[in-house]
A protein has these predicted regions:
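Charged, low-complexity, helix/coiled-coil-prone segments
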Residues: 1-15, 51-61, 108-109
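Residue-level recognition of alpha-helix initiation/capping sites
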Residues: 21-24, 60, 106
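Hydrophobic pocket/interface hotspot
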Residues: 11, 26-30, 38, 62, ...
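Short, low-complexity N-terminal intrinsically disordered segments enriched in polar/charged residues
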Residues: 1-36, 139
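A beta-strand edge to alpha-helix "cap/lid" segment located at domain peripheries
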Residues: 1-6, 67-139
Length: 139
């Protein structure tokens, strides 16, 4: 299996677990996907009301992303329909739907995740999604 195919397989299993557990597989991501050093970023860049969706530079801080996400939001689904791999990079394209717990409103959005791997572990991540839909669900 090529490195590209192996990286895609790592993500397929992680996203499968993420969707099926409705966000309950955080430990799996840390054990099986994230490298010792990871740069993890998100399109909102920490803007309220999704302060947790910002840049993280290490695994200890990265727990704050998942803690914030799961404290405020409840996953309805998270699917990846397509993977594009080239060299050490993988792009995952799909969609997701989350309910903001304080308002009960749903944010449904296309989702693009960019990944870079080194030695079978993710060392870089950046996520893109419809921030207008997410912000609207919080009001």
């Amino acid at each position: 299996m090529s490195n590209e195919a192996a990286n895609v397989q790592v993500l397929k299993e992680a996203y499968r677990r993420w969707n099926e557990s409705h966000g309950g597989s955080v430990d799996y991501w840390f054990e099986s996907v994230f490298g010792a050093d990871i740069s993890f970023g998100s399109l909102p860049r920490g803007v309220a009301p999704v302060e947790f969706a910002r840049q993280y530079r290490d695994r200890v801080q990265l727990r704050q992303y998942f803690d914030g996400l799961l404290a405020d939001w409840s996953m309805k689904y998270y699917t990846v329909d397509e993977y594009v791999a080239q060299g050490d990079m993988v792009v995952a394209r799909g969609s997701c739907s989350w309910t903001f717990k304080k308002t009960g409103k749903v944010a449904e959005t296309p989702k693009i995740d960019f990944w870079r791997f080194k030695d079978g572990k993710a060392v870089e991540f950046y996520e893109y999604f419809d921030t207008a839909a997410v912000f609207a669900a919080t009001t």
